[in-house]
Amino acid sequence: MDPTLTELLHSNLQWIFVGGKGGVGKTTTSCALATLFATTPISDAAAPDGTRPRRVLLISTDPAHNLSDAFNQRFGPQPTPVKGLEDTLAAMEVDPKNFTHGALMSSLTGANSGGSASSLSREAEADAVEQTASFARIGAVLKEAARTMPGIDEISVFAEILHYVRTLSYDLLIFDTAPTGHTLRLLALPQTLNSTFDRLMSLEGLAPMLEAASHLIGSSLGAVGGDSVSGCEVATAMPSSSSTAPGAGSAATGSSQGSWSITADEVRAKALHWRQVMEEVQDRFNDPSRTSFVCVCIAEFLSVYETERLVQELMKYNIGCDSIVVNQLVLKPSSEPPCRMCAARQKIQTKYLEQIDLLYDDFHVVKMPLLSDEVRGIPALKMFARFLQEPYNPDTHGYIDVQESC
């Protein structure tokens, strides 16, 4: 097959995940790919010339973010335009702390439960304050546990995916993923959460228990002044669901009578809404016309075999993957004199390249050269991206000097 990502570039994909073993160049590849897409117009029959600029959002899901380093620009948890490509490319780095510092956690610590207690007797006021302090202490423990909870990185990333699942703000989302293990847990989340919700909602007594608990918490927190605890709906952590959940509006705003509560019907409605959104995410994951995974590796034993395990897992989750980028290849012009170290590296790499060609003969395998310098900044990323759509030939292109090319 064509040893480039040209077919990917001219597709109408909406989500592209870039992943692989740590240290193989995932971030460089995803940033270069985002730059390439952002500078390539998208077909639009309504536009005068039949095309329009493609709006791309690059999201880092790796807890150790590197997008800021690759672009020489600071990014945060909100989409930020990339300098030089402000109209077509934005980037963001998902921060799990934003997920655990939401309104739900704040409310549990009593941050929103202030108000006047002048109408209460001294005894009632003291009891209410003591109860609220107890909930605050419990909330603080829950908050700290949430920050360090295993899987919180994947859950926070999934919350961002839910947020953008129905947005039309961007034509394409590119995910610079964490190393393989984190990424597989992320991709498995829709199935895992769906089955979990099914089991929970099959428990007939669950919703009434939550309803009773919400009334208890609401009466305790609302006793101090009767103010409602805003933003305490169950789906606070999922950005997209807070405004769209059918029948769930009263969970957050229906506390106007001075207590925080949620009914059994609202619990069921919220759970059904979550399930619907997650099924939509799952459908998009499994649609090769909308989602694709680009594997990145180097021609060494550990990387090649981890890539094979990754491809097998992607097949298990029914996620499309037909592109592999092999980075850091020692490719020398044939006219160059032999180098003992280079020859040794080439021998190792040739061995694993043969295995890659054998295993993935129906994949687009892009072979990228080892460069003389780091790839940082838009000019260097554009130079790198050139060889994602044009096979590198050392006799034709010679050595690629990043600094001179920029």
From Swiss-Prot:
Gene3D superfamilies: P-loop containing nucleotide triphosphate hydrolases
Record's subcellular location: Cytoplasm; Endoplasmic reticulum
Superkingdom of this protein's organism: Eukaryota
Record keywords: ATP-binding, Cytoplasm, Endoplasmic reticulum, Hydrolase, Metal-binding, Nucleotide-binding, Transport, Zinc
Pfam families (alphabetical): ArsA_ATPase
EC number, as in UniProt: 3.6.-.-
Top EC class for this record: hydrolase
GO BP of this protein: tail-anchored membrane protein insertion into ER membrane
Matches recorded under InterPro entries: Anion-transp_ATPase-like_dom, ATPase_ArsA/GET3, ATPase_ArsA/GET3_euk, P-loop_NTPase
Any one GO molecular-function label of the UniProt entry: ATP hydrolysis activity
Cellular component, GO annotation: GET complex
Binding locations of Zn(2+): C339, C342
List of catalytic residues: D62
Oligomer and partners: Homodimer.
Biological role stated in the UniProt entry: ATPase required for the post-translational delivery of tail-anchored (TA) proteins to the endoplasmic reticulum. Recognizes and selectively binds the transmembrane domain of TA proteins in the cytosol. This complex then targets to the endoplasmic reticulum by membrane-bound receptors, where the tail-anchored protein is released for insertion. This process is regulated by ATP binding and hydrolysis. ATP binding drives the homodimer towards the closed dimer state, facilitating recognition of newly synthesized TA membrane proteins. ATP hydrolysis is required for insertion.
Protein name in UniProt: ATPase ASNA1 homolog
